[in-house]
Amino acid sequence: MLIPDIWAETCDFDPEQREFDIEPYYTGPLLDAHFHMPAAFAPPPVVAHELPYEIAVFDDHISKDGLICLLDKQNIKSVIGFYPVLDNLPLDSIKDMKYFEEKHPDRVNAFLLPISISQWMKDEWPVLPGQDLEQYLEMLPFTKGYGEFAFYLEVYERQDEHLEADDPEMIETYEILEKRNMIFMSHPGNRDMPALLKMIEKYPNIIFLFHGEEIKKPQLSQILEKYTNVYYSLDYNMISNCCLHNNPQTDSKETFLPKYRDTFEQTMKDELRIWKPIIEKHPDKIMWGTDILKPWHIDEEVQPLLIEMSRSFIGGLDPAVQEKYAYKNAERMLGMVKTTQLPVDTTIPAWIYFHTWVNNLIQLLISNVIIGAAAIVAAIVGIVFAVRRRSGGTKRPKPARQDLEDYEEQYLQRQGQRPRRRHAKSRPTSSSCNSCGKPLKPTVKFCGSCGTRID
């Protein structure tokens, strides 16, 4: 990624020194699948009173460019950023969303969480009505998802009532998300899962992204295996036995860091023992995240240590799974890259591996037999030719001193033909026939005129 010159003056890109020597250690890119964007302003008292924690605020705790620097220093390619938007004060939040989209494209994958204060003041669920949600999305067409929708928050409860995932207010939201091909991200509790599973089946074209330790691990594994439109992000507040959120003993930088450092190595062993089998069973469905939210989470001493914990954890996974968990699964879910691997369990049965192994073995044996036989034949032929060459070969030599006619006679006899009469040796005869007196050639046997034999 090319960094503008101005960044060299404002952001220190020197790599952070590791505090722990844990190997193997993942050093590749990351994509944070659960990052709470700092609010545009401090929430009003009526909202702050209902929140169980303090949230980070832009320019109070970190600048917008400082946030990008925070990501760059840790080789975090991008984040899934959750923007809280209050319907009575939306403009500042909308400006923040547009700022990152225009100045730092592809660094923050915007998820919108509109909270309807006006609905809440009327003692109704603070879920933004569908018509208003459509207006927001028209202004923010780059929005990729809706959430984090935390069903456990007190704003979604009153007396004995609880907002259900299949209530009419939520159905209206799902219809809009399906039409716009957006992701629904939620933090459900155990009591929310039956209604959510109905929605997962009713809206197969919506991707449902979950996180949270309330979902029991056996149930999570079953859901990931059954539904192709469900993903899960495993975040810091689960990969730590001293927890980042809502723990009075560690709810500040000063109390968190000592305990986190003391338990770092043991935490790695414990969490890998628990999560490694689940991640490797569903290598295309689980992704890394931070759940950064509070002001001290983005502290320059805390955040690097959290990243070190994550990289140590990823290094303990199967190398074939590490990049998928670190960033590739999130990119595929967001539609940032194409892939030929479907987000389903595509494990090849063991019997197919055995069958393939047997076939390969048979083919290897046949090949070796053929090669061996060919080598033996070649050796035999070579020996025969060598012996023949040494003994003079099988070629029949022509007699060097035999008379031509004798050679011809032998040849004709071999061919089954009668040999021609051999010429008599020349001998002197009388010069004329004794009977008729005709002159004769010296070697004739009969007189050409009267036929008398010449002896």
Predicted regions and their residues:
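Acidic-and-aromatic substrate-binding clefts and catalytic sites of carbohydrate-active enzymes
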Residues: 42, 56-62, 83-93, 117-129, ...
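Acidic/histidine-rich helix-loop elements
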Residues: 35-62, 121, 156-162, 242-245, ...
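Mid-to-C-terminal alpha-helical segments outside catalytic/metal-binding sites
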Residues: 3-33, 38-42, 47-78, 281-285, ...
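Cys/His-rich metal-coordination motifs, chiefly Zn-binding "fingers/knuckles"
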Residues: 422-455
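Active-site gating/metal-coordination segments in enzymes
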Residues: 9-18, 88-184, 254-256
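Selective detector of the "anchor" transmembrane alpha-helix that sits immediately C-terminal
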Residues: 366-386
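Catalytic pocket-lining loop regions of alpha/beta-barrel enzymes
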Residues: 162-288, 296
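Hydrophobic faces of well-ordered beta-strands that scaffold small-molecule active sites
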Residues: 31-35, 78-81, 108-113, 146-148, ...
